[in-house]
């Protein structure tokens, strides 16, 4: 054969081989050990994760949910310390609804954020954006030995891209995990701060007075001042529908609810399953005898006692249904 024709045939054949190797339609075989390092990185990426939700144990004070008011008043300013906040009531399943706190102790908020809302708030502050987990394999070539296209082979050779993807997603998972843990801490701290008002004794008032040092209101007070805005400070401050509890309403609370004593307060749970906190203190009822006032003594026992009009005692308002 003529040497010129032989050389031309070799050139043409080489070109055809090169073209066939670079075609996407052709496949190459990859052995067992060729992609050990690459597969290890992919396995590490697939193993990366972050918390996907919250558990019941993440809420350190679940009892607060049963104590949160169902309805709040407009913002009020307490007389004793001049603190602004809100009063609200809880339906214990009795003839009246009981305020969640004593007069003079107010909630700083009317809405409590959930754990999920706290996490979203924190992620917004940190600028965390959603990121999908990188994918470098499919069912066809996820294990080795395998056959893959030449284009897939070239992509798979970029170990640096794999490392970069791993680092980005690993940082994302660590940031998400940190935000999740910080959200739990923030949520519980906020819950504690927002519910401290439940345990406060509040302001002390003389019976029949509309201010902490108003002793003049008792001169012409009726035997029961409940709902009378001239003498009932709960009605005067909170408005229509609110009043000091009568002796009978206190008795109903004592008889029909479960009382659990702690160091300096009671948790009182009604037939509805809802609860209120009653700090250990003396409490006024709305009733008098003509010479003395019926009070409720809540310390080591729960009992009615007679006292003077000028005694500065706590008031736990009620709301009529």
Language model regions located:
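Ser/Thr/Gly/Pro-rich low-complexity, disordered linker/stalk segments of secreted
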Residues: 54-58
């Amino acid at each position: 054969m003529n040497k010129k024709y032989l050389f031309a045939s070799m050139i043409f054949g080489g070109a055809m081989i090169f073209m066939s190797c670079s075609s996407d339609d052709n496949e190459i075989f990859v052995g067992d050990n060729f992609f050990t390092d690459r597969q290890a990185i992919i396995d590490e990426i697939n193993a990366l994760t972050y918390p996907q939700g919250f558990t019941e144990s993440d809420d350190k004070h679940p009892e607060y949910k049963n104590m949160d008011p169902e309805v709040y008043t407009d913002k009020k300013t307490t007389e004793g310390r001049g603190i602004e906040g809100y009063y609200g009531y809880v339906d214990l399943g009795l003839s009246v609804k009981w305020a969640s706190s004593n007069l003079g102790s107010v909630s700083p908020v009317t809405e409590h954020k959930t754990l999920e809302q706290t996490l979203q708030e924190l992620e917004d502050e940190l600028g965390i954006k959603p990121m999908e987990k990188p994918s470098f394999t499919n069912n066809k070539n996820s294990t080795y030995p395998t056959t893959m296209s030449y284009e897939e082979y070239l992509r798979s050779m970029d170990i640096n891209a794999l490392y970069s993807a791993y680092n980005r997603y690993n940082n994302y998972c660590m940031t998400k995990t940190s935000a999740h843990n910080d959200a739990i801490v923030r949520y519980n701290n906020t819950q504690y701060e927002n519910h401290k008002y439940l345990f406060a004794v509040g302001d002390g008032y003389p019976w029949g007075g509309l201010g902490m040092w108003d002793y003049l209101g008792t001169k012409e007070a009726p035997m029961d001042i409940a709902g009378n805005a001239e003498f009932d400070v709960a009605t005067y401050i909170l408005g229509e529908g609110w009043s000091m509890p009568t002796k009978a309403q206190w008795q109903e609370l004592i008889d029909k609810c479960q009382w659990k004593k702690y160091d300096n307060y009671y948790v009182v749970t009604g037939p509805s399953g809802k609860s209120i906190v009653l700090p250990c203190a003396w409490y006024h009822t709305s009733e008098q005898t003509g010479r003395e006032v019926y009070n409720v003594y809540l310390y080591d026992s729960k009992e009615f006692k007679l006292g003077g009009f000028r005694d500065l005692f706590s008031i736990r308002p009620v709301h009529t249904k």
